């Protein structure tokens, strides 16, 4: 049996762009992705602190050090530029093994 546990969390990511007519996904600055141990095409849950919306999508690598956080496709309707997001990924693990330590990145404090 496997269970889902928190693997990575980017807190207080500010939406910098949105592209309704793109095929889908969330674009994240590749340096932020590296800090959070999130890879391209990884499934993530996106939680919008401004309106309570939650959605699942996959990650596209953005330009390094651009601070890009952009929702694309239909997900663009669920945010506004300037909204604050939590971006969360999970891992499937065997509960009888040692727990993984999640990678937490807080963009508000820089941690």
UniProtKB/Swiss-Prot annotation:
Cofactors that this protein relies on: pyruvate
Enzymatic reactions: L-aspartate + H(+) = beta-alanine + CO2
Protein localization: Cytoplasm
PTM annotation: Is synthesized initially as an inactive proenzyme, which is activated by self-cleavage at a specific serine bond to produce a beta-subunit with a hydroxyl group at its C-terminus and an alpha-subunit with a pyruvoyl group at its N-terminus.
Gene3D superfamilies in the record: 2.40.40.20
Annotated residues for binding of substrate: 57, 73-75
Lyase recorded as keyword: yes
Entry's cofactor comment: Binds 1 pyruvoyl group covalently per subunit.
InterPro entries assigned: Asp_de-COase-like_dom_sf, Asp_decarbox
EC numbers, comma separated: 4.1.1.11
Gene Ontology terms, MF aspect: aspartate 1-decarboxylase activity
Keyword annotations of the record: Autocatalytic cleavage, Cytoplasm, Decarboxylase, Lyase, Pantothenate biosynthesis, Pyruvate, Schiff base, Zymogen
Pyruvic acid (Ser) PTM positions: 25
BP-aspect Gene Ontology terms: alanine biosynthetic process; pantothenate biosynthetic process
SUPFAM superfamilies membership: ADC-like
Top-level taxon of origin: Bacteria
NCBIfam families referenced in this protein's UniProt entry, alphabetically: panD (TIGR00223)
Protein function: Catalyzes the pyruvoyl-dependent decarboxylation of aspartate to produce beta-alanine.
Protein name from the UniProt record: Aspartate 1-decarboxylase
Organism (species): Francisella tularensis subsp. holarctica (strain LVS)
Taxon lineage: Bacteria, Pseudomonadati, Pseudomonadota, Gammaproteobacteria, Thiotrichales
């Amino acid at each position: 049996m496997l269970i889902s546990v928190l693997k990575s969390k980017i807190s207080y990511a500010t939406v910098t762009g949105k592209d309704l007519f793109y095929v889908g996904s969330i674009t994240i600055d590749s340096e932020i992705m590296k800090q959070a141990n999130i890879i391209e095409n990884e499934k993530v849950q996106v939680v919008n602190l401004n309106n309570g919306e939650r959605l699942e999508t996959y990650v596209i690598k953005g330009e390094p050090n651009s601070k890009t956080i952009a929702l694309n496709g239909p997900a663009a309707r669920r945010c506004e530029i300037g909204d604050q997001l939590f971006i969360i990924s999970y891992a499937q693990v065997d509960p009888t093994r040692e727990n993984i330590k999640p990678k937490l990145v807080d963009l508000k404090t820089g941690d």
